[in-house]
Amino acid sequence: MSSGGLLLLLGLLTLWAELTPVSGQDRPVKPGLCPPRPQKPPCVKECKNDWSCRGEQKCCRYGCIYECRDPIFVK
């Protein structure tokens, strides 16, 4: 294989490796439940899914509000 073809293959593999985790659709949701709705202006969108939040936080939906919140756990 020529060096140009090898570089192209390496570039495509790198791009594929970078784009694969972005989907996040196959990942299970994080444990815990979202706490009660906060008092905030309507339609604030801080996150898209649990994996766009830091650490153990979950992406919680309250109507059109999406925000990262610490989970609560119910026994």
UniProtKB/Swiss-Prot annotation:
SUPFAM superfamilies: Elafin-like (SSF57256). InterPro entries: Elafin-like_sf, WAP_dom, WAP_four-disulfide_core. Residues 1-24 form the signal peptide. It is found in: Secreted. Residues 27-72 form the WAP domain. Expressed by the venom gland. Disulfide bonds join C34-C60, C43-C64, C47-C59, C53-C68. It comes from the Eukaryota. Pfam families: WAP. GO terms for biological process: antibacterial humoral response; innate immune response; venom-mediated disruption of cell wall in another organism. GO terms for cellular component: extracellular region; extracellular space. Damages membranes of susceptible bacteria. Has no hemolytic activity. Not toxic to mice. Does not inhibit the proteinases elastase and cathepsin G. PANTHER family: ANTILEUKOPROTEINASE, WHEY ACDIC PROTEIN WAP. This is Nigwaprin-a. It comes from Cryptophis nigrescens (Eastern small-eyed snake).
